[in-house]
Structure formats: structure tokens, C-alpha cells
Amino acid sequence: MKQEQSHEGDSYSTEFINLFGKDTATHPSSNNGANNNGMGSTNSLDQFVATASSSSSLVTSSENRRPLIGDVTNRGNTNLYDHAVTPEILLEQLAYVDNFIPSLDNEFSNVDWNVNTTHNNANNNGADTFSSINANPFDLDEQLAIELSAFADDSFIFPDEDKPSNNNNNSNNGNDDHSNHDVLHEDPSTNNRQRNPHFLTQRRNTFLTSQYDQSKSRFSSKNKRNGNNGETNNFGDNMQNNHPFEPNFMGSPSQFPADATNMTSIDHGGFTNVDITSTENNTTGDNGVDALSNLLHRTTHTPNRSSPLSNVTSAQNSSSQQRKHSESKVDSNSDNNSSNKAPNITVPDYSIIPTSVLVTLLPRVNVPNGAYNSLISAGFDNDQIDAIAAIMAYHHQKKIRENNSNNNKNINTNDSQEAPILKNINELLSVLIPPSPAETRGPTTLSTSPSFNEHGVVAEASFLSSILELGIKHPKSNNIHNQRQPSRNDHKISRESDGNNGNDNVHHNNAVIKSSTTRGDEIAKIRSEPTLNASSSDHKENSLKRSHSGDLKNKKVPVDRKYSDNEDDEYDDADLHGFEKKQLIKKELGDDDEDLLIQSKKSHQKKKLKEKELESSIHELTEIAASLQKRIHTLETENKLLKNLVLSSGETEGIKKAESLKKQIFEKVQKE
């Protein structure tokens, strides 16, 4: 091992100086440390594989030998920092590199995931062509994040340094990166003990810290941009995504707010807020969907790692970031679709709500006491009875609403039917009734003539409309009259035959019929009142209309002759004809009501007769019961007397007499 290391020591030293800088302090064993680094040839990978087998034992042994931060006395007393320890430490670093840095074979399996880290530009034809690969020297951001998180963990301690208590970003700024001097930090707890210069310098630590902060800032800015936009970055959306990445390792690292739930400590905790897994990209361009980008469409991907530690770390980060990404995606979708979606209306589950609570909010029918008791005896609960009452109230209200709607419909239809009829009546009246000849009279007659014409037309219209209303409201009155005419004749015949008979029941029936006829007339008058109101007003208006003739009937002035022409006669005939029709309609209604009253009265009389028969039968039964009670009482007294006689005599003769008396008594009872 050492011979191979001596041949390749110069190449490794140059690479080491290029990466980490050159130590300013001199040490006699520095050359030996450069020659005995144990790295071997950079071109041969077999040594890395060989060292990987001994990595676990080296790590455990080094951790056993590695002093803690607070163990100062042991560190000062033991000689851990001699030239013999250097190869083991470097071998430990090589084992770490071999375990945590994936091989080329492992990288080829992730080509479809790594290619999507590049940027593409959309040309005019709509096909996206890949531009130059990102200038980031560290292609695999996820690999770098896992690597640096292992270095930045609190439990990881380099053997050549004491980790400061406040090793934050402010202590390692960009100004220290340009400095070529190597300042050895003094620790008061180690009694101003200086660090051996053959180990890795502070510049290496500054480089790693700045690299860690730069990666962290890049990922955090990416997360912030995705969180603000509510969606993933699209290829070719804006010019900000097309410029190559230029790392600024020498600048000051950006500051981040320390979250108590995410950061394990102030000193560069694990990558808890870094988006290791890449989110999905929308590959739609301005002119269509790119086929190549669809083939390389990146899904949520976890890189394949050869080390168990790296797999655990990447899995934890990926799961946490997937959860964050899903939550942000749901929030963004809800924000974008809030204006398009209808509000979510939640209907309560009525099956969970008790019946008593539901019934208190609903109208209920008052349940009588008898019905309530019968329902309870049938096995119903109070809640069930209340529910039945609520259902009955609902149906009752529904019927009322339906009846009101039907009445409104009927009123509307009647109005629509009566409107053209009244219009035709007015037209007929305007044709039939000529202008009055009072226009040739003086001013007094002229002043009264317009009112007369208006009143006459209105009177005729109202009178005819009342007749039509009667016909509309009672369209089946003629049919009813014709159907019940033979029944009326039968009633008349029965009345005549009953009149010839001289029984009391017949006289009583005649009296009932007379009272029923009077009641029928009253009912007919009550029913005809709404229709006769118009006729009464018509009569008044007709009287006003005839007032211009000087009260024809009362005063009989000669003006009667003047106006008794053929037209007035026709008008009077029409009036009389309408009045006769009205009287006929009233008679028909009265007859119908009379028939109904007669039938009801007959049924009432039958009920009364049945009641009388029942009363008489009950009276007879009570008399029979009383007679039986008397007989029983007499028999009991006779038995007592017989017993007394038997006890007093005590002889056979007395017994015989008693028996003879019994026989006589029984014979009497049987005869009765």
C-alpha cells in the first residue's frame, strides 16, 4: 500500500492543494503526510473498493478512539495526533467516499431523472430542444445535499478540530475564503493548544460550509418560488429558468430562519427543509405538447444509493417533501378552483338527530287524550306520537295549499271566461239600446239623460252578468231539476195519500214537511243572497232609469204615453223575462233544498222510532226483573217459615206437613 502511495503521491498532493489549498504552517512530518496519504492512484478504482470492505471496522474503531467535545483532559493527556494516526483517518475518509458517492453504474439508472435538471428553450416550430447543460459543477444536487448533511450533522466531528459551540453562518463568511493565511483557532478549554498542521485546514471547513449553505439557499429559493406560484416550474415559461446556474462559492452564504421543528440545531443541522425530490413539470409549450419532454417527463423520484445511510436519509427527505408538495398542491388547486367550484353545502344527517329534537322544530297536530291513550296502549312512544302529529300537520297544510291553489286557478278561469261574455253583453246592449230622445229636451232633461243612459247600461250588464254567473255556478241545476222532478211528484203523491189518512204520524209528518219547506225557503234565500245583491242593485238602477218618466206607476203622468213606444215595451219584456228566469232558478234551488231536508227528516224520524222501540223494550225488561225479584223474596220468606216449623215440631208429622206445604207452594208457583 505504501509503495503504491509513494508513486502517486505527487498527483494526489496537487489535487489536494487544488481542492483544499496549501497549509501555510510547516511541520516535519508534512511531507510524509503528503507521501503517505493512502489515497493511491486516482485512476484505479480497485483500491476504493478494497477500502470499502474495511470501512465499517474503521469507522467504529475511529469512533471509539475519537474524543468527545467536552473531553478535554483526555485529549490533552493522550497522544492522538501523531504521524501514525494519519493514514487511518485518510482511509476512513476514503471509505466514506466509497460508500456515499454512487458509482457510474448506479448513475446510469437515474439518467431519466438527471436529464430533466437541464433547461430547454422553445423554438418557433413548437419543438423543445435541449440547451447547454447546466453549468453547475455539482450535477447531482440530491447527492451533494446528502453528502453535506452528513458532514454538517452535530454528531460528525473531524478528528483534527473541536467544533465551536456557535458555528453559524456568520462565523464563516466569504472574506475568509480569499485569505491565504491559516489562522489556528485557540480554544480556552485546551489551554491554548494548537492544532497539528498536517490535518485538513480550516479552509477546507469553510469550503464545505459555504458549499452546504449555497446548496441550501438554492433549494430553499426553489421551494419558495414553487410555493408562491402554486405550481411547478414549466420549461420555457420565462427567461428566469433559462439562464445557467453560476455558483458563487466565495460569496457570503445566505441566512435562513431557524425553525425549531425542522432544524436540529443552529450549527448546520440536517437538510430538513430542502426539496431533495424533484416535483413534476408541466411540459406544455406555447404551440403544443412536446413529445420529447413527454418521454422525459419527470416523476417523483428517489435516487438509488449504495449506502444504507444515504437511502434512509433520502427516503426521509423524500417522504417529508412529498407530503409538503402534496399539501401545497392541494392548497394551490383549492385557491385556483375556488372561484369555479360551487360552495360545498353540507346537509345534516337527520338519522343521527333524535326524533324529539326534530319534532320540536316542526308544527304538530293537537292529539286528543283518547287517541293519545289508545296509541300508548297500542305500544307507541311519546316521540312516535309526536312524529305522527307532525306528519299529519304537514299533510293538512299541504291540502290547504293545494285547495288555495285550485281556488285561485278556478277564479282565474272564471274571470277569463266571464271577460269576453261581459264584453259581448256590452256590445249587444250598445246596439240594442238606442240613444234616448231626451237630447231634444231642455237643459234639465239633457243633464239627466247621460246618467240615465249610463245607469241603464250598467244595470242591464250587471243583471245579465248575474244571470250568467248563476248559470256558470250552477251548470247542472237543470239536470238536477229534471232528475229530481219525479221524486218531487212521488213526494206530492205521498203527501196527498198521507193527508187522506187520519193517523197522528201523518199529521206529524205534514207539520214536519211544512217546517222543512219554510226552512228550505230560508236556505234558498240565504244561498241566493250573493247572486241577488246584484239584482237588488239592478232594481234600484232600473227605478232610477224609469225616474225620468215621472214615476210611471205612482203618478201616471201623460209622459207615460210619450215613452211607451215599442222599444220600451221590448225592454220591459226582457226585464220581466230575466226576472222570471231568476224566480225559476230560485224555485229550483228551493226545491232541491226541500228534498234534501225531507230526506234528512225521514231518516231522523226513523231514528226516533227506533229509539222509542228500544226504550219500550228496556222498560219491559225492567218490569220483568222487578217481578222476578219479588218472587224470589217471597220464596225466601216461605223457606224461612218452613225451617222454623220443622225445628219447632221435631216430629214426623211436622215433617210431612212441611213437605205437603212445600208441594202446595211449588204448585202455586208453577200455576202462577
UniProtKB/Swiss-Prot annotation:
Keyword annotations from UniProtKB, A to Z: Activator, Amino-acid biosynthesis, Coiled coil, Cysteine biosynthesis, DNA-binding, Methionine biosynthesis, Nucleus, Phosphoprotein, Transcription, Transcription regulation
Entry keyword annotation includes Amino-acid biosynthesis: yes
Phosphoserine modification, residue list: S416, S564
Record gene name: MET4
Auxiliary: region residues: 312-375
Stretch list, region Inhibitory region: 188-235
Protein name: Transcriptional activator of sulfur metabolism MET4
Gene Ontology CC: Cbf1-Met4-Met28 complex; nucleus; transcription regulator complex
Annotated stretches, region: Required for interaction with MET31 and MET32: 375-403
